[in-house]
Structures are given as structure tokens and as C-alpha cells.
A protein has these predicted regions:
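The serine-hydrolase catalytic nucleophile loop
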Residues: 4-17, 30, 169
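Alpha/beta-hydrolase active-site loop
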Residues: 10, 41-62
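Conserved alpha/beta-hydrolase
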Residues: 15-37
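Catalytic active-site module of serine/aspartate enzymes centered on a nucleophile-bearing elbow/loop
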Residues: 197-242
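Short beta-strand/loop motif that positions the catalytic acidic residue
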Residues: 150-152, 157-159, 163
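Short alpha-helix in the alpha/beta-hydrolase fold that links the catalytic acid
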Residues: 14, 144, 153, 167-176
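Catalytic histidine neighborhood in serine/cysteine hydrolases
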Residues: 175-194
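Hydrolase active-site cap/lid region
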Residues: 81-140, 146, 186
Length: 242
């Protein structure tokens, strides 16, 4: 699931890592993004309802066995907001979510203006009232950290050490408060930089285990998966050569 000001194309990088594990992907545009209709986004608040509908659709189609959610930034927040109300989700990959929206806004305001939170609060309240009228949700209630205490789904948290937009402590705080089985990966880069290979490899192994893909693979699909691994290496070598 993609971040703010993005679309489903953000998911393309994961294809070469997940398909060899016999893991299919459902990539989509949130409302108000990409080719989807809608005027506003809500940074996870209403997007979780998009996810609920998609999960319901996939289960009704009976073409998948288990379902995991992989999200970055807004997409990771959406996954956390959905997870505590749907414990049947098998796994979560959470790349750079914020822990609390009002906290994030105060941090960004101070970072770019050096204004103390005492001065930011009245402006934030004005913005909150406008959002309530137009988008119909309260930004003060957009707090993923309030949801993780009720989440028990295996989760892989990840953050870039140089992220100056959603700082690494947000992922750390969420990880520390999370109640389910959890892992945490840190890598070099910033909020929107390309993720390193070891992150994708770690996430692939994590999903292969939690989705129990090994129990579903037949000899024919194992052969196909091996071919895909070879092809993935060829793609990497080509990128390095370029």
C-alpha cells in the first residue's frame, strides 16, 4: 500500500522479490490517488475502509489462502489502523509509519519554522476544524500507537535512519508498544529513497514464513520459483551494469 502523493506503481519493486516465493500481489490506488476517484486523502483514517473492502473481496473470490498487508508511510499507517479490527490478517510489513499525526505535525512545524508547539497548536486546531468539515475525521484521533496495543499479528517494522520527514523514533515507538511478534529493520536512506535489497529479502523471508508459503508450494511451482530467482539476479546485475 502506497504512501501519500503516490500510487500503486510504488509496489512494482516488490514484484521481483515476492513472486519467486509464490506470493501474489494486489496493488491498488487509494481513493484520491492515481487512477482512483475521490478528492481527498485522510492519511489512513478512511483508507482503512478501502483495505477492509479489498480484503473482503479477495476472500469472497477464494483465490487466496492467507493475506498480509505491506504498506509504506500512509500505507503502513493504514495497515496498523486495520490490523486491530481484523486479526485474521497473517502478517504486516510496516515501512516508516507515523505513531501519531498531531505529534508529527508539531515536529515538522518546529523543524521548518522553529515555532514552539505552543504557537503551533492554535494553527493545528484551525486545520483540524477545516479537515473535520471537509474530510469528516479528527486528526487528533489519527494515532496508530493507540491501536498497536490491540494488535497481535506478526509484524516487520522498518525505517530509514536518515528519514527527516517521519523520523525513525516513530517506527521505534510503534515497535516497542506493539503486542504481537515483531521485528525491526533499519537501513540507510531517507523517507522516499530506494529501499536496499536486504530489506526486500528480509521482508520476503518474513512473509514466506508467516504466510506459510512452504506448505503450499508444489514441485512445479518450486521449479518456477527457482527460475524467477535466477531472473531476479539477472535484473540486479543489469541494473548494476547501467
Amino acid at each position: 500500500m502506497h504512501g501519500n502523493s503516490s500510487c500503486r506503481l510504488e509496489s512494482l519493486e516488490t514484484v521481483q522479490y515476492l513472486l519467486p516465493q509464490n506470493i501474489s500481489l494486489f496493488c491498488f490506488d487509494f481513493a484520491g490517488c492515481g487512477n482512483s476517484g475521490g478528492e481527498y486523502i485522510s492519511l489512513g483514517w478512511w483508507e482503512r475502509d478501502d483495505v477492509a473492502l479489498i480484503v473482503e473481496h479477495l476472500r469472497e473470490q477464494r483465490r487466496v489462502s492467507t493475506i498480509a498487508l505491506w504498506g509504506r508511510s500512509m500505507g503502513a499507517v493504514t495497515a496498523l489502523l486495520h490490523a486491530d479490527r481484523d486479526p485474521s490478517i497473517a502478517a504486516l510489513v510496516l515501512d516508516s509509519p507515523f505513531s501519531n499525526l498531531s505529534k508529527l505535525v508539531n515536529e515538522l512545524a518546529y523543524q521548518y519554522t522553529k515555532l514552539p508547539s505552543l504557537l503551533v497548536s492554535p494553527v493545528l486546531q484551525l486545520v483540524s476544524n477545516t479537515i473535520k468539515n471537509k474530510v469528516h475525521f479528527d486528526i487528533y484521533k489519527l494515532s496508530p500507537i493507540d491501536h498497536v496495543k490491540n494488535s497481535f499479528i506478526p509484524a516487520l517494522f522498518a525505517t530509514a535512519t536518515g528519514d527527516d520527514f517521519i523520523k525513525p523514533h516513530h517506527s521505534q515507538d510503534l515497535h516497542d508498544a506493539y503486542q504481537g511478534d515483531k521485528n525491526f529493520i533499519k537501513f540507510e536512506g531517507d523517507h522516499n529513497s530506494a529501499r536496499p535489497t536486504f530489506f526486500y529479502d528480509s521482508a520476503s523471508i518474513f512473509l514466506f514464513t508467516t504466510l506459510q508459503c512452504g506448505q503450499l508450494l508444489t514441485e512445479s511451482t518450486k521449479f518456477t520459483a527457482e527460475q524467477m530467482k535466477v531472473r531476479r539476479k539477472e535484473i540486479r546485475d543489469k541494473k548494476k551494469a547501467e
